[in-house]
Amino acid sequence: MDNREQLRRITELTEQIAGLPKGYLSKKTIGGKVYYYHQWSENGVKQSRYLHDSEIAPLADKIEKRKELQAQLRMLKSQKSRRNEATGMKCTFMHKRTPVAELELDDVTGFIQKIGSVYAPEHLPIGIPVRNEIADRAAFNDWWRDRSIPASRSGVREALESLGVADTKMLLVRCYGLSLSDQYWICPEGAELRWEDINFFQNDFSEDIGDVLFGERKKKDALNFSSPDSTSDGNLKKRWKIIDGKRCLIKGGSNPFRQQPFNEVIASGIMERLGIPHVSYTVIWSKDAPYSVCEDFVTENTELIPAWRLLQAKKQKNSTSRYRHLLECCELLGIGNITPFLDRMLVLDYIIANEDRHFNNFGALRNAETLEWLGMAPIYDSGSSLGYDKMPGQMRSEKDVVCKPFKNHHAEQLKLVTDFDWIDFDRLSDVDELISGVLFCEEAADYIDEGRIHAITESVQRRIGHLQELAMTQTPRQLDTTEDDVREEVAADYAPKMEL
């Protein structure tokens, strides 16, 4: 097989594999009945979905087919050939204006094949070790993969087919890896590109990718891939737009209630009342569906480092809790005031019953050129809360409420709070009006009825009351224990779930 045929076959196999489900089937017995579910990992995050009986056999066949194709692809890649010369793209990994390392990317998969000279190891993403002047390729690929759109996002597979791209990592390559969250990018060999001319903070960007991700018909002309939508994470439908000169993120909600956009506004109102630094949200409507809108809080001089990357600053001991490990990592990196920030975040998440505060949903800000830490970022992304996927009865019982990032249950996370004195409970006296004002609107009635609104209001008021009792009776103390720690960093799965 010559190089051209080999490349054609590799591309074909890669596209076929991308269209098949990952992971494996598992089962568990509840009340004597066996339930099957699909389990897989996405960007290092474990995901799972319960299956109807009719789904089990077809899904098992597809997973087995994926394994067969992966074996063929591995065999093809292992053959001695000049494939790397045919498909490798050499580039310089940049941090704003600073050359950091030489890379070679696979033209088909977007993976990092080789890492050459490292010029500025201090500018590498946190958690990528350098040994004997060589950067760890596996760790670099993990970071690069996390930068791409997750394959689990709603509508992404259809979007890839429409774009003619086999893997979301190839979208990264086509936009030079540029983002509106940080200042990293890649400069292809021989390209005379300057950060000032191509970054999305100071230059306009195409809406083509966002249009396709939102299911809008692909235009007849050639697509412009220069878009920050290629480097946005998360499973919900989202896109970037320039509105009145500001970079704004537009994000949807999940069926059946489409509640997340409204929850962002409610959470913003609660944080405003409590004096918690936060990102402000509003709701807009498009094609009879609600979307939240927020302005980018990162600028051309700063960047967001998610807590997940902060945790990579040092190895976690088995006897150390996730909470304690984060504190130690922040101390090692020189990030101050982490404890007061976590106090406020955990209290907020208890009030709104947030279920998805994973380690990529909060982080720290730093100067991209000097690497000076500026403190923790304002709190953002609080939509998967307020019983967003639950019925009113479930909201009132709260028996199904789980949480992240440190403990599995909010009651245990509250034990990590060191100080309640900053909470002005009088400022929360009108929370019921806040919730009603956001949810009682004509458009929202198609998704959220009056009974649901009352259940949300009652649940929030009950949690505020319990928090007030706790603040008066409990002496806050940090618990350095791994009991009830979150073991898997599982992002919210918005796929329909089978009722148990």
Which residues fall in each region the model found?
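A positively charged, amphipathic N-terminal helix/segment that binds anionic biomolecules
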Residues: M1-S81
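Canonical protein kinase catalytic loop motif
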Residues: H358, G363
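Phosphate/dinucleotide-binding and metal-coordinating scaffold of catalytic cores
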Residues: R74-V347, I351-A353, A364-L500
